[in-house]
């Protein structure tokens, strides 16, 4: 993937949203946090940044689901949604995010295999011969983005995950990948 950008207003997204809306569905085309450098100096750097960007996309898609459930319950349902029928559809990286959002149940799903052993392709060597996960829950947040987390003070201490709409379900009832990969977790 050499694309570090995309938008909720890209032609495909607008066309699909319009078609589904004409069929009576409530549609929201949502952006998610971008941010990886496809031209980073090493493959390891590019992989690390891409995995972290995909993780943020999962968090953002789940936060959007909670936003709509919260708006239905607390704000008089301004969008007219059925909170029991919430789905995700994505294309390209958005397709990857919809699949990951529907298959990752917990943080351990992205770092450990079914037997509890590290999924080594999602770990990296920071340069000292040790291996650490590419995504660290205490720094990057949980997969649902329901905890506030910050980068270490040594690299700025800025917020990486802001908990929003905590207490509402992030569950989706269906997902459709209209083009995009599925990360091989095992």
Where do the protein language model's features map onto the residues?
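Glycine-rich His-Gly loop
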Residues: 1-3, 91, 95, 180
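Serine-hydrolase catalytic core
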Residues: 165-170, 180-186
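Feature marks short, surface-exposed loop/turn motifs that line or immediately flank catalytic pockets
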Residues: 34-36, 95, 105
């Amino acid at each position: 993937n050499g694309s570090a950008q995309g938008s909720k207003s890209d032609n495909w997204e607008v066309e699909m949203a319009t078609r589904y809306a004409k069929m009576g569905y409530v549609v929201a085309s949502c952006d998610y946090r971008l941010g990886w450098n496809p031209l980073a100096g090493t493959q390891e750097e590019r992989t690390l940044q891409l995995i972290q960007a995909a993780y943020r996309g999962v968090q953002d898609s789940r936060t959007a689901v909670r936003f709509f459930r919260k708006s239905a319950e607390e704000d008089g349902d301004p969008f007219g949604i059925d909170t029991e029928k919430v789905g995700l559809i994505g294309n390209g990286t958005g397709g990857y995010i919809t699949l990951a959002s529907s298959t990752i149940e917990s943080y351990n799903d992205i770092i450990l295999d079914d037997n509890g052993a590290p999924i080594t392709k999602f770990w990296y060597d920071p340069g000292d011969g040790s291996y650490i996960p590419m995504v660290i829950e205490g720094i990057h947040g949980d997969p649902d983005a329901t905890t506030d987390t910050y980068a270490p003070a040594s690299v700025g201490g800025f917020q990486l995950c802001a908990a929003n709409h905590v207490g509402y379900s992030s569950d989706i009832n269906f997902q459709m990948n209209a083009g995009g990969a599925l990360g091989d977790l095992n």
